[in-house]
Amino acid sequence: MLTGKQKRFLRSKAHHLTPIFQVGKGGVNDNMIKQIAEALEARELIKVSVLQNCEEDKNDVAEALVKGSRSQLVQTIGNTIVLYKESKENKQIELP
């Protein structure tokens, strides 16, 4: 579980990132969760954009992504979700 200080630190790191995944009309599926889990292992911190044509609520999408990829939700702002998962092999971010 992330503390408030750690979330603030990760939000500042994520500010300059661009979303690398988009959740659209199809919603969240197993293939997308697998790809997000692989991206989290490589990058540790990613942004996911929820498109307007997505039929699911953005909070439900965030919850599904967190459960499926076993990551932690840093922030949901607008239609953008920020996820963090500590990498096992190539750790880049040192939390305060």
From Swiss-Prot:
The keyword RNA-binding is assigned to this record: yes
Residue ranges occupied by any CRM domain in the UniProt entry: 1-96
Source superkingdom: Bacteria
Entry GO MF terms: RNA binding
InterPro entries: RNA-binding_CRM (IPR001890), RNA-binding_domain (IPR051925), RNA-binding_YhbY (IPR017924), YhbY-like_sf (IPR035920)
Entry keyword set: RNA-binding
UniProt xrefs under PANTHER family: RNA-BINDING PROTEIN YHBY (PTHR40065:SF3)
Protein name: Probable RNA-binding protein YqeI
Gene this protein is translated from: yqeI
